[in-house]
Amino acid sequence: MASLFHLRFLKPLSCLQAGLLYSLIFGVLYHFPLFVYVYKESNQVSFIAMMVVVLFCVNGALFLALGLISASLMRWSAIVFSLLNSVAFYFISAYKVFLNKSMMGNVLNTNTHEVLGFLSVKLFVFIVVFGVLPGYVIYKIPLKNSSKKAPFLAILALVFIFIASALANTKNWLWFDKHAKFIGGLILPFAYSVNAFRVSALKFFAPTIKPLPLFSPNHSHSFVVLVIGESARKHNYALYGYQKPTTPRLSKRLADNELTLFNATSCATYTTASLECILDSSFKNNAYENLPTYLTKAGIKVFWYSANDGEKNVKVTSYLKNYELIQKCPNCEAIAPYDESLLYNLPDLLKEHSNENVLLILHLAGSHGPNYDNKVPLNFRVFKPYCSSADLSSCSKESLINAYDNTIFYNDYLLDKIISMLENAKQPALMIYLSDHGESLGEEAFYLHGIPKSIAPKEQYEIPFIVYANEPFKEKHSIIQTQTPINQNVIFHSVLGVFLDFKNPSVVYRPSLDLLKHKKE
């Protein structure tokens, strides 16, 4: 193998030649999804030609600029980018994602367990074919010492070509401006490198979180359970008309008029942004503290139990991960890996805090892909056959949907169990369940979530929103019945309204965003 490379590249390449060759390799190997997107959206071959010029110029300028510093730096950067590009290329191809700022925020917030869930043979093949092999070729191409003048002039020439090409296509600027963030999310390595830097910079320079004006809570001794689901889409809930019996327990409760359903959409198609929206006050459209922190400061007991990630800047009475909760539970090994572990302490909380105002937030693992079957105990995998592969495109449509529907079936059991505990509670108790966002299961060749909402299919943002109140709660509050679509931003004010003393209400509270009517005694 080595001898073949030495024969082919008998003469060492100059920095200029190598930089342009690397640019050509990158343009050919990793940008088929970009060309498909551009042609699909424009139906113009000339637009693809424009993108070829752009790719050659930007990648060429990148490598030549690195070459001005050091030929070795240029080579090793190309090798590293080859490996990173292969992973990015896999996810773009397999899940139809755009590596924009929001998606890179998701990537940087991904934990080890979620990363392991994406491992597959297909990913390994992509890394070998599009990462290791090109990297090896680049490594074996000999480089020679050469003048810095030629690469510098070439960079100027590439910049000139880029500008000239842009000026020649002024009539198409509006189209490119409209699609810029999607095109940018497909140009490698800039998509992930630039956007990862943007996300990191935003975190570093994040504005200081401001305190909200304090309020005096009432003495209703209410217990609110806010259940935040993961990747649950409304379409697959029998409650909302889905043909398969995915929610038998909740459907019975709905028939008995125990539940209220809302037509809701998520603020975003990824967890971090949706969580911020759910917990945000929208007060003066600025960076103010979120709901759990605000209520905790007011003296309300706030507990956050999580089987998920994405939470940040949360100050509560107690924050526990599911594995921490389960350590206190004897003989709970069977439920330890699953969302049911979050419910272990709920009966104790109801008893111990019966004379206090309490908010319990349960952040579920829910229907998080791609390994849907791992979110469900064996006895809840009722829809068969079900897909158990991380490579969702390799699964049949039936098995993929069955795997997902099993997560909804299990979620039905969890919510019913919560309701059973609350309906027997002495204090006023309310449960609100909503998902952070939806999920794609192969519709329009999309999988998972995270597509920018402006172009995302409805499956990624139409979510279930379910409310239950026990009898003591109904004596003091009523749930508004409406068919008007709502957003996740109603949560802050609906929960705050439960705890407000309306004789001295908070200036933050917005009644128009409250799903409840309160008896203002």
UniProtKB/Swiss-Prot annotation:
Entries under Gene3D superfamilies matching the protein: Alkaline Phosphatase, subunit A
One MF term in the entry's GO annotations: phosphotransferase activity, phosphate group as acceptor
GO biological process: lipid A biosynthetic process; lipopolysaccharide core region biosynthetic process
Domain of life of the native organism: Bacteria
Keyword presence, Cell inner membrane: yes
Pathways per UniProt: Bacterial outer membrane biogenesis; LPS lipid A biosynthesis
Subcellular location: Cell inner membrane
Assigned EC number: 2.7.-.-
Keywords, comma-separated and alphabetical: Cell inner membrane, Cell membrane, Lipid A biosynthesis, Lipid biosynthesis, Lipid metabolism, Lipopolysaccharide biosynthesis, Membrane, Transferase, Transmembrane, Transmembrane helix
Topological relation to the membrane, as annotated: Multi-pass membrane protein
Bilayer-spanning residue ranges: 18-38, 47-67, 79-99, 118-138, 150-170, 182-202
Recorded GO CC terms: plasma membrane
Pfam families listed in its UniProt record: EptA_B_N, Sulfatase
InterPro entries for this protein: Alkaline_phosphatase_core_sf, EptA-like_N, PEA_transferase, Sulfatase_N
Function in brief: Probably catalyzes the addition of a phosphoethanolamine moiety to the dephosphorylated 1-position of the disaccharide backbone of lipid A. Lipid A that is 1-phosphorylated is not a substrate for this enzyme.
Family label: Belongs to the phosphoethanolamine transferase family. EptA subfamily.
PANTHER family given in the database record: INNER MEMBRANE PROTEIN, PHOSPHOETHANOLAMINE TRANSFERASE EPTA
More details: In this organism most lipid A is tetraacylated without a phosphate group at the 4'-position and has a phosphoethanolamine residue at the 1-position.
Official protein name in the record: Phosphoethanolamine transferase EptA
Taxonomic source organism: Helicobacter pylori (strain ATCC 700392 / 26695) (Campylobacter pylori)
The gene coding this protein: eptA
